[in-house]
């Protein structure tokens, strides 16, 4: 047999196995490019995973260090130091984030040309009074309504209000001067400037809350709850001054005015005063000053 058949020839068209070349390199040798010392990433007894889908295990600080050419560090620091950057910091990263061994370089934020941070506008409290320091002239809202001397003022009709809730209720229900879309009720001719206010008004026509005992309908669930208590006899709201109890909280508040010393309603014919408007009306209907 000719000797040429026994000699192994290397083909220039064959792709070399870089994984085998990587594992067969010298453990402690010099880099052919820069002459620096090459330190292995893993010890000799721990080989790299052979399956492409497997990820390398986390590093062991006692046995593994970053594979980096030592003479290159002074050159990198010298090149970056000329640009005004601070000293570099080498930190470990999770090897699962990337297959290759990466050494991130982190510099100081003082030398980066980053845009300034966005400053969000401050939302002022609507309870700021005109006598408090730093009170804004305008509030953050749909139209940034200015502060009136007595509180809040409507932009369109210039009607003042003491609270922001009162102004919002006025703009939704009563103010027809503001420019914008108007929502009209399909059951009556009332108009509203917000869809939410219109939906609350439509409930007065549809009456979706119905009593299962008598069939009476209500527009609000709490009105139905107070009505059901008239069937069950439940009266959870008791007066702290007497032994009376009520099924609804509003009736209790009206009753508490009878215990108050301040009588706000006065009869125009006599000097008698009453704590509630209904009591005054009953007094006038009965005839407080009968004729001779």
UniProtKB/Swiss-Prot annotation:
Residues 1-20 are annotated as: SNAG domain. Keywords: DNA-binding, Metal-binding, Nucleus, Repeat, Repressor, Transcription, Transcription regulation, Zinc, Zinc-finger. Belongs to the snail C2H2-type zinc-finger protein family. The lineage of its organism: Eukaryota, Metazoa, Chordata, Craniata, Vertebrata. It comes from Homo sapiens. This is Zinc finger protein SNAI3. The keyword Glycosyltransferase does not apply. It is found in: Nucleus. GO terms for cellular component: nucleus; transcription regulator complex. Binds E-box via C2H2-type zinc finger domain. It comes from the Eukaryota. GO terms for molecular function: copper ion binding; DNA-binding transcription factor activity, RNA polymerase II-specific; DNA-binding transcription repressor activity, RNA polymerase II-specific; RNA polymerase II cis-regulatory region sequence-specific DNA binding; sequence-specific double-stranded DNA binding; zinc ion binding.
């Amino acid at each position: 047999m000719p000797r040429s058949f026994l000699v192994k020839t290397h083909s220039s068209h064959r792709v070399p196995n870089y994984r085998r070349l990587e594992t067969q390199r010298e453990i402690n040798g010099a880099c052919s490019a820069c002459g620096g010392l090459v330190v292995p990433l893993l010890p000799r007894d721990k080989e790299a995973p052979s399956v492409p889908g497997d990820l390398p295990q986390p590093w062991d600080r006692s046995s593994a260090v970053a594979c980096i050419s030592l003479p290159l560090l002074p050159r990198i620091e010298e090149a970056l130091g000329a640009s005004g950057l601070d000293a570099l910091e080498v930190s470990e990263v999770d090897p699962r984030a990337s297959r290759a061994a990466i050494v991130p370089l982190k510099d100081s934020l003082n030398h980066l040309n980053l845009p300034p941070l966005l400053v969000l506008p401050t939302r002022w409290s609507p309870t700021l009074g005109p006598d408090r320091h730093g009170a804004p002239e305008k509030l953050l809202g749909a139209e940034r309504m200015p502060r009136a001397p007595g509180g809040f003022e409507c932009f369109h009709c210039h009607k003042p209000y003491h609270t922001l809730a009162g102004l919002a209720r006025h703009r939704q229900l009563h103010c027809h001067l503001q420019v914008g879309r108007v929502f009209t009720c399909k059951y009556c001719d009332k108009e509203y400037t917000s869809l939410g206010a219109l939906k609350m008004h439509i409930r007065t026509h549809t009456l979706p809350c119905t009593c299962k005992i008598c069939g009476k309908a209500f527009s609000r669930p709490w009105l139905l709850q107070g009505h059901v208590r008239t069937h069950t006899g439940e009266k959870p709201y008791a007066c702290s001054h007497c032994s009376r109890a009520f099924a609804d909280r509003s009736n209790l508040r009206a009753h508490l005015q009878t215990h108050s010393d301040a009588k706000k309603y006065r009869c125009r014919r006599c000097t008698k005063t009453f704590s509630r408007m209904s009591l005054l009306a009953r007094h006038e209907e009965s005839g407080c000053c009968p004729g001779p």
